[in-house]
Design a protein with these regions (language model features):
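Post-signal-peptide N-terminal segment of Sec-exported extracytoplasmic proteins
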Residues: 34-71
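Mid-chain, structured segments of secreted extracytoplasmic proteins
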Residues: 63-100
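C-terminal partner/receptor-binding element of secreted or periplasmic proteins
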Residues: 90-117
Length: 117
């Protein structure tokens, strides 16, 4: 029994250290494309960062709810801030929208489909 507990504990520790990184594309005003990546950590949520050369935007999120949705604050180096909402289509991809405080709506895409933007 003790060895079973040890094996289970090691498996949980191994999984908790797994970070998975996915490509991200964000399409802002005038079809300005930001590219970057999102990193998800098992049971801890994750973070993303994108840039378009002149501006960088980033956000951090908690694990998805049962609905597969995450909500996250966004902050950009040009001073813009907003709130994003994204839904997982599957464990490796999905998308949603970021609504900035200035009222603009930005498209948020992560996973393989972000590579096509």
């Amino acid at each position: 029994m003790k060895s079973l507990v040890t094996v289970f504990s090691l498996a949980v520790l191994g999984l908790s250290a797994c970070d998975v990184t996915h490509p991200v594309a964000v399409v802002g005003p005038s079809n300005t494309v930001y590219r970057g990546s999102a990193t998800a950590t098992f049971l801890e949520g994750g973070w993303f960062q994108v840039n378009n050369g002149a501006n960088t935007c980033r956000g951090q999120y908690n694990p998805a709810t049962d609905s597969g949705m995450v909500t996250f604050p966004v902050r950009c180096t040009n001073g813009l801030t907003g709130v994003g909402k994204a839904t997982y289509d599957n464990p490796r991809s999905g998308g949603g929208e970021i609504v900035m405080r200035d009222g603009t709506r930005w498209k948020f895409i992560f996973g393989r489909q972000a590579l096509a933007v």
